[in-house]
Amino acid sequence: MKKKLFSILFMLLAVLTLTACKNKEKESEEKIVKEEILEGIVDGYKFTVTDEVTDRVRIQMNNGDIMLVVLSNSQTPITIQNFKNHVQKGTYDGLIFHRVIEDFMIQGGDPTGTGYGDDSIPNIKGEFISNGVKNDLSHTKGVISMARANDPNSASTQFFIVHKDSDFLDGNYASFGKVFAGLDVVDKIAKVKTDGNDRPLTEQKIKSIKFITVEKA
């Protein structure tokens, strides 16, 4: 009887220990996901999140992956100011890359997460050649550009990051900056499995986009 009772107690203790370990692992995983990374080093660049509006931003994914972007195109002031406004408002925080095509681009920034956009958000003028605006920034790998509908002036919040050089987009989309550190994250997202609508089967969520200061590490 004592042996049987001891066996039961031992089994219960083992189950409780295993459960505690699993809960600890889960808690650790959730902590990684929930943490805002305020400073760090990516590809030799040291970044620090700042409340000041700058020309560089940190895109943090929910899994902790980081991309650093420079908003560098002086020919697209409207586009850059629009993007900065949405970063300030926190528009992009918690949104997903809803459309991913390997060897082409990854697209996100839609508050609805569908690609149809939010009609309540104002559109901006498309700053590209076919719309009467000079824009010499070619759509090479890592370039960030505004997504839009057929109307050349229909861009609002959605953007895409080029995965493979796509100069056929030049002249028709407002390219306004480039990923200068963390291109491996673009590669990683671009390679995820997708459904027939190019939507990732595993959610690719942006934790936040924040302004940063940058220096060489």
Residue ranges and their predicted role:
Residues 5-9, 16-217:
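Cyclophilin-like peptidyl-prolyl cis-trans isomerases
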Residues 1-2:
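N-terminal secretory signal peptides that target proteins for export/translocation
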